[in-house]
Design a protein with these regions (language model features):
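Donor-sugar nucleotide-binding helix/loop cap in glycosyltransferases
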Residues: 1-177
C-alpha cells in the first residue's frame, strides 16, 4: 500500500478504492498509520504463510474486526458512536445522520463534519453492517463480511433495525482480547 499505482494493479481496483482499503485497514489497526506495513495483529491474522485467518473465513475474526472498529473513536467515529451511544431499535439513515450530528455538536471540541461527510459516514455504516435485501443478489453487489454478524438489519428501502441479542458465535477468545 505504499505505492498507489502498484497497489491498484495488485488488488485490481482503482486508486480511490486502494485509499479506502488503506483507511479501513488503519482504522482496524491492521496496518501501521506511518509506514503502512502490517501491524503485529495484521500479520497474526492475515499473513498468507502463517496467518490465523488469511482469507477472513473465521467468524471470530469478524467479531475482532468489529470490536477494533467500534472502539476506534477517532477513525471510525460513526461506527463507535452507533454501537456505544445510539440505542434506538428501528431507524433510517436520516434519523441516524440527525442523531450523529447532534451527538457531535454536543461532544466535539473540534469542527463538526460537513453534512455530506455525515451522510457518507452513515451510508458506510449501513453498507458495512446490513446485508443487502434483494430477491436475487446481483453479481456486482457484494455485502461486507461484517454484515454476517447480524448487528444491523435492513427493512425496505431505507429502514434498519438493530437490537441487543445473544451472539453464540462470539468466541470467548475475542471477549478476552
Amino acid at each position: 500500500f505504499e505505492d498507489l499505482d502498484s497497489a491498484t494493479v495488485t488488488l485490481g481496483v482503482g486508486k480511490n478504492m486502494v485509499q479506502s482499503i488503506r483507511y479501513w485497514m488503519r482504522a482496524a489497526q491492521l496496518i501501521d498509520p506511518i509506514d503502512n506495513h502490517p501491524t503485529d495483529l495484521g500479520t497474526l491474522l492475515f499473513d498468507m504463510d502463517s496467518g490465523e485467518d488469511p482469507f477472513l473465513e473465521d467468524q471470530g475474526t469478524l467479531w475482532l474486526l468489529h470490536w477494533l472498529l467500534a472502539s476506534n473513536t477517532e477513525m471510525a467515529t460513526a461506527i463507535s458512536w452507533f454501537f456505544s451511544k445510539y440505542h434506538k431499535a428501528s431507524f433510517d439513515q436520516g434519523e441516524l445522520r440527525a442523531a450523529l450530528s447532534s451527538y457531535l455538536q454536543e461532544s466535539m471540541i473540534k469542527k463538526r463534519p460537513a453534512a455530506a461527510t455525515l451522510k457518507s459516514d452513515i451510508s458506510v455504516l449501513a453498507r458495512l453492517y446490513a446485508k443487502t435485501q434483494m430477491a436475487i443478489v446481483a453479481e456486482d453487489v457484494l455485502d461486507s463480511p461484517l454484515s454476517e454478524l447480524g448487528l444491523i438489519f435492513e427493512h425496505g428501502k431505507s429502514g434498519y433495525s438493530s437490537t441487543f441479542q445473544d451472539h453464540s458465535d462470539l468466541p470467548s477468545e475475542i471477549v478476552g482480547f
